[in-house]
């Protein structure tokens, strides 16, 4: 049985800081080492941090180059955060999808709105913590932020979570393994939808139907 090439699926994975999004995505990729799934590498104008590698963690661009790409319409979505640009490259995403890879966009609800304008078929997942108390505890365990910064993050998290209803799926990350299984089911089920299966098994269907 020969399967025909098929485009990968595009997913938006969004969550407030501390909900466990990055850990879930990382664990899902580790479960599928065949590289059939991949996180899109964003572009940014901020300076690389120690240990960050060009093209692996981010595509680092100058402000001038980033703004030129905005004018040329080369981003699905972009935003300016604390004086630095961040964006999702059309070319990067479309190249990965053409290779048949499922692509995850790690963006916020505002970026999700922009992406839906270009990719109405995108599937989106919003991840939330089981409670505000647990979210604050997770932020404090990191040991990276002051009380003031944590308070700001909590306020921002509540504002972000008010947009949960704009997404296709909602995951409450109260148990990591259960949440990982749910995220995996969402991704794998999308691969079985009719448009993809019709392309993937076009030769089989042609033979069966004569």
From Swiss-Prot:
It comes from the Bacteria. Its main location: cytoplasm. Disulfide bonds: none annotated. Pfam families: Guanylate_kin (PF00625). It is found in: Cytoplasm. GO terms for cellular component: cytosol. SMART domains: GuKc. ATP binds at residues 15-22. It is an enzyme of class 2 (transferase). Its EC number is 2.7.4.8. GO terms for molecular function: ATP binding; guanylate kinase activity. InterPro entries: GK/Ca_channel_bsu (IPR008145), Guanylate_kin-like_dom (IPR008144), Guanylate_kinase (IPR017665), Guanylate_kinase_CS (IPR020590), P-loop_NTPase (IPR027417). It catalyses: GMP + ATP = GDP + ADP. Transmembrane segments: none annotated. SUPFAM superfamilies: P-loop containing nucleoside triphosphate hydrolases. Residues 8-188 form the Guanylate kinase-like domain. Keywords: ATP-binding, Cytoplasm, Kinase, Nucleotide-binding, Transferase. HAMAP family: Guanylate_kinase. Belongs to the guanylate kinase family. Essential for recycling GMP and indirectly, cGMP. This is Guanylate kinase. It comes from Idiomarina loihiensis (strain ATCC BAA-735 / DSM 15497 / L2-TR). The lineage of its organism: Bacteria, Pseudomonadati, Pseudomonadota, Gammaproteobacteria, Alteromonadales.
